[in-house]
């Protein structure tokens, strides 16, 4: 009898390890395949840990082939290349869309996604809006999605809990901005993992969304005080109601050592009460979870508590200078990626004049030249076999400004709501010295996409304008 196969995206994170352990304890133990963008020699309970770049649809298709279930635990809040242009929300969306597409192609039965609690508030932060957008992208291609929405997951190695611990450790007095008065219904790591295990392969959970959390919902300032008590480091509290979100991000990053890219979206999401609407899944599974105090004590007492959270670690410097650049631009009503790619090729020859000359042939291969140059600076070739109406792909196949790479590419894809187009360059390796690339070609690319976005909106401006006006 062939075992079920479960693929875990984000397997090497602290939640991923716990979920892997929970799934491995099933009586009919499934094959567990972990995906990672980093090292594959990490110890874990999975059967295989395979390298996979979630930004590559090809990689994801190969990774989920033969799987029956996919567990998605990925949040792209940290750099995935030497240079990254684009918001974490757009990066997250591309990864989720690739998983949704690949899962549908492979006949995957269910995707289980651990997202964030969504408050009843129209003014959601970019972080929480992104979580909801990821849910939509995972299910946009027909695979049943089970979403578990959680606030803070408390456990050893958890970046959010580690931020609280480091604030208590390092500050002589606790600075309490106004957002610390909001409530958070946190959940302990083991209960979160057990609930994911509970819904994987359970047909009644297909297509369902559940809020999960512990039995209490303390204020953030009370959570900080609780951690101080458990560490025997009681600190006097100083209320600072006028501390802006921007200043909060700066001082939290400075004090804790957490990357600013990680702190910023987390701080933004703390301006809401993060509480469950109900806990029906936990009632059904008989997994009420621990109080915050119990969860915090367990996390602090864990033998793993000295481990540095994965989100705090700097990614190893890549052997090549990889570039990832993503822009979100408005898409006219009723149009798709195929139309946008055709329009891009039609627009290029005149759209970059007088800065660049672009020749486009009948096969939609675009060659970029300096105004009077004879050798192309960049060559893009349309990938017919890898393109569809809602995703168009071009490979970078040559030019003086590009090093040879079989993975460098430009793509256009439509967002799940159909209102925007994501234009993305992935794994591009420039031939220019790094310092020169950053102050020249990297800036030109952003300006080109800004101008194309303006063209789609029916307006235009000069390529080398110094305007900083946002276009999307």
List where the protein language model places each region.
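Substrate-positioning beta->alpha
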Residues: 95, 159-160, 179-201, 207-208
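Hydrophobic ligand-binding cavity/cleft-lining segments
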Residues: 290-384
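Beta-strand/loop substructures that line and gate deep hydrophobic ligand-binding cavities in soluble
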Residues: 401-439
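Mid/C-terminal beta-alpha module of Rossmann-like enzyme folds, strongest
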Residues: 199-262, 273-325
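Conserved beta-loop-beta element that borders a ligand/cofactor-binding pocket
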Residues: 136-157, 163, 170
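A conserved amphipathic terminal alpha-helix motif
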Residues: 435-472
